[in-house]
From Swiss-Prot:
This is Bridging integrator 3. Gene3D superfamilies: Arfaptin homology (AH) domain/BAR domain (1.20.1270.60). Its main location: cytoplasm. Residues 9-232 form the BAR domain. GO terms for cellular component: actin cytoskeleton; cytoplasm. GO terms for biological process: actin cortical patch localization; cell division; endocytosis; myoblast migration involved in skeletal muscle regeneration; plasma membrane tubulation; protein localization; regulation of lamellipodium assembly; skeletal muscle fiber development. It is found in: Cytoplasm, Cytoskeleton. InterPro entries: AH/BAR_dom_sf, BAR_dom, BIN3/RVS161-like, Bin3_BAR. Involved in cytokinesis and septation where it has a role in the localization of F-actin. It comes from Rattus norvegicus (Rat). Keywords: Cell cycle, Cell division, Coiled coil, Cytoplasm, Cytoskeleton, Septation. The keyword Cell division applies. Residues 16-57, 120-151 form a coiled coil.
Length: 253
């Protein structure tokens, strides 16, 4: 975070070293980047799970629409095929829902909780900035009296200004030290915090796709006809389509 330089009552004496400023900028910059990455990851994970659910729900709807097709009443082979498809789609949807629930619980919610910490952290940085501005203002006040002729009234005001400065300086130094100590610790903790979540994400995906392999393997065995390759089915479709195009009701004028 880059604070606004003091324009009114700016002290001549540098109250924060360039090294400290650079260290603070570096550590806070890393946390700002982490905050943005956490928000983006949470948003992308939510979009991904929503898309997964929409996909499986659409697949179930398609199979139900096919079951209501009049062909199922006229052709038992077609009914058997569509029934097998409907069963597979419902199984897929059930496993998909389990996967999404697991990801919501072990990935998205932890991301949300982690992200909820950043507003407090940003507020602590703002309090540090305010303390720095107060420190600079009072330091400039002390310097003003130090430059004046040392008369009785001036010395009294100088003493008072120094008394006002001391607790403000100590407050800033305490806030600054706390942030410089804790910001790196917070940043480094991200690995330990997120590792269980990402392990859970991988497990959920592995379980889901293992089940999908079984489901669609079973479906393939039920639907496969010996000697019917994809090329054979494509030729059959083209033949049927040519027959339909030959009908007078669809023939070109």
């Amino acid at each position: 975070m880059s604070w606004i330089p003091f324009k009114i009552g700016q002290p001549k004496k540098q109250i924060v070293s360039k090294t400290v400023e650079r260290d603070f900028e570096r550590e806070y910059g890393k946390l700002q980047q982490l905050e943005e990455q956490t928000k983006r990851l949470q948003k992308d994970m939510k979009k991904s799970t929503d898309a997964d659910l929409a996909m499986s729900k659409s697949a179930v709807k398609i199979s139900l629409d096919l079951l209501s097709n009049p062909l199922c009443e006229q052709d038992q082979d077609f009914l058997r095929m569509v029934t097998a498809l409907d069963t597979a789609m419902k199984r897929m949807d059930a496993f998909n829902q389990e996967k999404v629930n697991q990801i919501q619980k072990t990935v998205i919610e932890p991301l949300k909780k982690f992200g909820s910490i950043f507003p407090s952290l940003n507020m602590a940085v703002k309090r540090r900035e305010q303390a720095l501005q107060d420190y600079g203002r009072l330091q400039a006040k002390v310097e003003k009296y130090e430059e004046k002729e040392k008369t009785g009234p001036v010395l009294a005001k100088l003493h008072q200004a120094r008394e006002e400065l001391r607790p403000v300086r100590e407050d800033f130094e305490a806030k600054n030290k706390q942030l410089l100590d804790e910001m790196p610790r917070f940043y480094n903790s991200r690995l330990d915090y997120f590792q269980p979540s990402f392990e859970s994400l991988i497990r959920a995906q592995v379980i889901y796709y293992s089940e999908m392999h079984k489901i669609f393997g079973d479906l393939t065995q039920q639907l496969d006809q010996p000697g019917h390759s994809d090329e054979h089915r494509e030729r059959e479709n083209e033949t049927k389509l040519s027959e339909l195009r030959a009908l007078s009701i669809v023939a070109d004028d």
